[in-house]
Amino acid sequence: RPARARRVEMMATSPSALPKIETGVAAHLDQYETHDGRNVLVAVLDTGCDLAAAGLQKTSDGRNKYVDFLDCTGGGDVDTSKVVERDADGRIPGLSGRSLVLGAWADGVDSFHTGGTLLFPLLPSSARGRIQKERKASFSATQHAAMTEAQRALDAIEADATLAADEKSEKKKDAELLLKELKGMMDKHDDHGPMLDVVVFEKDGVWRVVVGDGADLTSATPMAPFATSQQVGDFGHGSETSYCVQVYDGGDTVSLVTDAGSHGTHVAGIVAACDDDPARNGVAPGAQILACKIGDGRLDSAETGTGLVRALIAAKRYGCDLINLSYGEPFPSATSGRVAETFAAAVREWGMAVFISAGNAGPALSTVGAPGCISEAICVGAAVSPQMMADQYSTLPYDAAGTSYYFSSRGPTPD
């Protein structure tokens, strides 16, 4: 399995896919070509991002697009506190029960942190559902073939007139039992997915992680934390899911960081995509991105207050200039509590600009969601122009000024 994920190519798109004319971005960049987000760091708080996506590899001035990718939900955390040493054959016991064969990458290392996790909980629901369907089809084909063979064997026993009665009875019972068990396996099939072993070790002062689904890890490529290595892996099994690693607690915790859906990549592309074709660029192709996953895969990519606060603290630690949060929901009280207080601190104390979506609960008044309704945030609704109607929504344009789209949430807020 390669340590570097396959680059996902971008399809051709209309130059009007992003409303750069309506927002004044096109005119601004025509006049100030290098004022395109260079030296600006944007924290994208969302489902996480596909690190292999086209247009999100480099900035316009050649820097890495992502400075880091953090899972603020804890959903990808793996307990690697168990420390083991090599046995007489140079192997180590994996948490899966496998006896793991190490490669030359482990030379000179005496002890290893080990842990394990199932693959499926790490994957976005779209990839997980597709793989489960494919694996079920493969299992069903094999199982049906075995059931057909078992039925033929049973039919042959019943038709064999040369067998003594007692012998026929015993063979028939065995064949019927086999057929029953095969049918039961089909009916009770429950695929939990591959079990991954996670091996962590420190070498040359750098923590490194190896993730494998088999006993032979000789050809595995150790991955270091993303911020320093920019290493991206692929889980294989047809998942087409990129991931990076983070190491915490002195090697006792590993975070396998994946996205929980495509929304975060979509947002990151709008903000800062930089493609070979400038027409496919985002608003600020020179900007860098800190990807903070706040969409928890265990909650169908919903966010928690804890995840939001972790992401805001990370944005402060990395020195972000801007925060984008395209999440929101109804609220009983949006101006009190730790989440609101931390957003307020990000603006008033840490000097960041915070942009939050209004929500999609319009067109009624006072439908704006939280945390977009807090006073410190710049709350952004959805607008549509005649050209956007044709290019983005497949509706007939008409000669009228742009307007707020019907689904966009609106104010005023309760305060």
Protein language model regions, located:
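N-terminal mitochondrial targeting presequence
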Residues: 1-6
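Active-site-adjacent substrate-recognition loops and nearby beta-strands
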Residues: 22, 26-29, 57, 331-333, ...
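Subtilisin-like serine protease catalytic core
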Residues: 29-145, 149, 156-159, 166, ...
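Active-site neighborhood of phospho(di)ester-bond hydrolases with catalytic His/Asp-centered motifs
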Residues: 45, 324-326, 354-359, 380
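Catalytic-core regions of hydrolytic enzymes
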Residues: 303-311
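Conserved structured catalytic cores and adjacent interaction surfaces
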Residues: 307, 318-321, 325-326, 353
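Catalytic-core regions built around general acid/base machinery
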Residues: 338-354
